[in-house]
Amino acid sequence: SYPENDDFIANVSEEVTQNVLRLQHHVCLAIWCGNNENEWIWHQEQKSSYKKMPGYNIYHKVIPAILKNIDAMHPYWQSTPFGNDEDPNSFESGNTHQWNIWSRWIDYTEVVNDKSLFVTEFGFQGPANKDTFEKYLPIKNRNISDQVFEHHNKQVEGPERIIKFLSAHLPIKTEWNEYLYLAQLNQAFALKTCLEYWRTNKKTNGSIIWQINDCWPVSSWAIVDSDTK
């Protein structure tokens, strides 16, 4: 959430204007989006309408007014996820972020219960490649329960999630090399399962994976590690 005083709105307006003029001619640009998950998190945590959210006018009035004047060609979406329902992450309209799977400890096979119209964010964690880890991780730390190894997963209970979902589908190996391979394989199975389900579900018009890459050697949602492997 952000303030809506005159000075801050003026600063936002200038920043939006400069960046729209800078980026609007890129051929890969499909849509402008006001924010990431602000309305959704407000609705979840405050149990009230996102229209009461501090900063609401920035996304629903200020930014669209600027775009109308300098780039009316590209569509604008106030937030992601967002739709016409009270719940910004509803299956009934707009787009969704599917984080019941993984973040809320739900197995990826439960994707069959997802009725999204368009999934603009979903993902599943796996470790970086063995060669990438070996560049920074001494032999003494190459253990799945080692604190240095676990430090390179920044989600709360991220390593525990990897183990839980791995145990549901593949053998649990305590040997470090085998663990890396099987955890990567399970990440691939998870993404494949979700993508194939949404491709065959006529209600779902598309899905976007979070995320393509990462900036350091880590276990994360990335499918390409920091060494581009």
Specify the residue positions occupied by each region the protein language model found.
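Substrate-binding clefts and catalytic carboxylate motifs of secreted carbohydrate-active enzymes
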Residues: 32, 65-68, 80, 90, ...
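Short, electropositive alpha-helical surface patch
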Residues: 51-54, 87-102
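Active-site mouth of glycoside hydrolases
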Residues: 1-75, 79-82, 86-87, 207
